[in-house]
Regions:
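Basic/aromatic-rich interaction segments and small domains that mediate binding to polyanionic partners
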Residues: 6, 10-61
Length: 61
């Protein structure tokens, strides 16, 4: 199974979405990473869409 790069982010980290590709209304949202799926997508309290650590711009807060 291929390991996907989560850029060091882990469950429990507080993050801010700086830029989510194709979803500008998520930019600036803050939340906690609640799970990471098998594809390396980050799911959390910022809303219904997953963050892709290798595509979207996020930062720890």
């Amino acid at each position: 199974m291929q390991k996907h790069d989560t850029k060091g982010f882990k469950v429990g980290d507080n993050i801010r979405i700086v830029e989510m590709v194709g979803e500008p209304h998520y930019n600036g949202k803050v939340g906690v990473i609640e799970s990471i799926d098998d594809m390396g997508q980050l799911h959390g309290s910022w809303g219904g869409l997953a963050v892709h650590a290798d595509e979207d711009k996020i930062e720890r807060v």
